[in-house]
Amino acid sequence: MREILHIQGGQCGNQIGSKFWEVVCDEHGIDPTGRYVGTSDLQLERVNVYYNEASCGRFVPRAVLMDLEPGTMDSVRTGPYGQIFRPDNFVFGQSGAGNNWAKGHYTEGAELIDSVLDVVRKEAENCDCLQGFQVCHSLGGGTGSGMGTLLISKIREEYPDRMMLTFSVFPSPKVSDTVVEPYNATLSVHQLVENADECMVLDNEALYDICFRTLKLTTPSFGDLNHLISATMSGVTCCLRFPGQLNSDLRKLAVNLIPFPRLHFFMVGFAPLTSRGSQMYRPLTVPELTQQMWDSKNMMCAADPRHGRYLTASAMFRGKMSTKEVDEQMINVQNKNSSYFVEWIPNNVKSSVCDIPPRGLSMASTFIGNSTSIQEMFRRVSEQFTAMFRRKAFLHWYTGEGMDEMEFTEAESNMNDLVSEYQQYQDATADEEGEYEEEEELEQE
């Protein structure tokens, strides 16, 4: 079957990742010891996308956990589902990356990377037909960003034809953990543009806003934020794990969402988001889901889709519903808001339907959009980067690990190129495209 190998790195990646496994285990009826306690055959039908079945009948996640310090790993191991992972798949160093991308990418991380790759190979050999990899990491720290991108480039070399999907937590605009986030994030984006196929962009601030505004939580914890992320992660892959009327996989997703190879950074959303108390009082309908899903307040990264245009988008519905109604709603959205979609990609919204809803809901939907407005986020990080780099602030931490200033300059210009590419396609109109073609024809004559 089409397996996906899950890799989580750094503190953020491990925390998101372990939350994700709680959700997926719950959906497939697998208890914290790896035994199946579910009620429906559908839970087991494609359980091998994310799990190996051990000889004793236990299910073991296809997960590789890495970090440069033991702390977060220990808390995963002692957490609710800590005993389900294969002990050999915990790979950790002792030194820590200290929020330094260079340590994660060149020094400390480079020493540990071979042992991580060994585990990845072992897991990949266990697969029948490996579809791809999903990596959870943050771009602001040292391990997830530096070592995460190192691992992605190594896997790219070894498995060039497999999909590489990342769930990347970007530094948020107002809430900053460390002062060097803009450096780490820019260096990481430089890598992700080249080596990843699809990046789901998340950011803490947008997640805080959702918890605060929509879920009415007064003091959201990281656990609450990660719960939102895990709902989305589970939604992205539900088509692979459960039967559906309109299935999609990572490759189909990429083909439908990526018009130009470098523009593969997506905003994600999830519906229904209602506060825990009010869930039971609201009926769920396809139009309601659709409306909430396209709402800019629902996006899990700090960019406003109303400031740009959608190149493409994909909606994954879960639950028993009529596909006709789904299609009608999607067409409706496009017709009503046609100015927010580029007109030179007709039918640029794809939908898929999976029959099994998430636990506790009758229907749900996951939204993935490729919008030019995501440049706001890159632009913001880039401005912060330039402000510090112009003064060469904090650079010695990076050059001390053997990095060259040249690399910073390259990463900066790559990110600025990305921003202007998004801008170029945001401004492009169908008539312009037509004019080019005519000119070319004349030249050929």
UniProtKB/Swiss-Prot annotation:
Q: Give the residues the record marks as binding Mg(2+).
A: E69
User: Which Gene Ontology terms cover its molecular function?
Assistant: GTP binding; GTPase activity; metal ion binding; structural constituent of cytoskeleton
UniProt main location, coarse: cytoplasm
| Location in the cell | Cytoplasm, Cytoskeleton
Listed Pfam families: Tubulin, Tubulin_C
Q: What's the cofactor?
A: Mg(2+)
Q: Which domain of life is it from?
A: Eukaryota
Q: SUPFAM superfamilies in the record, alphabetically? A: Tubulin C-terminal domain-like, Tubulin nucleotide-binding domain-like
- Entry keyword Nucleotide-binding: yes
Q: Which PROSITE patterns match?
A: TUBULIN (PS00227), TUBULIN_B_AUTOREG (PS00228)
The positions annotated for binding GTP are Q11, E69, S138, G142, T143, G144, N204, N226
Instruction: Indicate the quaternary assembly.
Output: Dimer of alpha and beta chains. A typical microtubule is a hollow water-filled tube with an outer diameter of 25 nm and an inner diameter of 15 nM. Alpha-beta heterodimers associate head-to-tail to form protofilaments running lengthwise along the microtubule wall with the beta-tubulin subunit facing the microtubule plus end conferring a structural polarity. Microtubules usually have 13 protofilaments but different protofilament numbers can be found in some organisms and specialized cells.
Stated role: Tubulin is the major constituent of microtubules, a cylinder consisting of laterally associated linear protofilaments composed of alpha- and beta-tubulin heterodimers. Microtubules grow by the addition of GTP-tubulin dimers to the microtubule end, where a stabilizing cap forms. Below the cap, tubulin dimers are in GDP-bound state, owing to GTPase activity of alpha-tubulin.
Q: Under which name does UniProt file this protein?
A: Tubulin beta-1 chain
Species of origin: Triticum aestivum
